[in-house]
Structures are given as C-alpha cells and as structure tokens.
Amino acid sequence: MICYNHQSSEPPTTXTCSEGQ
C-alpha cells in the first residue's frame, strides 16, 4: 500500500492511500 499527500497545501495528516504499487 502506498500513502502520499494528495495536496502539498494540505497537512501531512491528510493523505491518500492506494492499494497497489
């Protein structure tokens, strides 16, 4: 699973996780 921030203007606590590479 890969987690990353969906927007750099938003805090690192809000991120998006996707199952897969």
From Swiss-Prot:
Record's signal peptide = none
> Where is the stretch described as Disordered?
1-21
What is the annotated tissue distribution of the protein whose record heads this document?
Expressed by the venom gland.
Is Secreted a UniProt keyword of this protein? Answer: yes
- What post-translational events are described? Contains 4 disulfide bonds.
Q: Which domain of life is it from?
A: Eukaryota
Q: Does the keyword Nucleotide-binding apply?
A: no
- Provide the primary localization: secreted
Write out the entry's keywords from A to Z: Acetylcholine receptor inhibiting toxin, Disulfide bond, Ion channel impairing toxin, Neurotoxin, Postsynaptic neurotoxin, Secreted, Toxin
Q: Where in the cell is it found?
A: Secreted
Please name the GO terms that the record assigns under molecular function: acetylcholine receptor inhibitor activity; ion channel regulator activity; toxin activity
GO cellular-component term (any): extracellular region
Spell out the family assignment given in the record's similarity comment. Answer: Belongs to the three-finger toxin family. Short-chain subfamily. Type I alpha-neurotoxin sub-subfamily.
Job of this protein:
Binds to muscle nicotinic acetylcholine receptor (nAChR) and inhibit acetylcholine from binding to the receptor, thereby impairing neuromuscular transmission.
Q: What is this protein called?
A: Short neurotoxin E1
- The source organism is Micrurus pyrrhocryptus
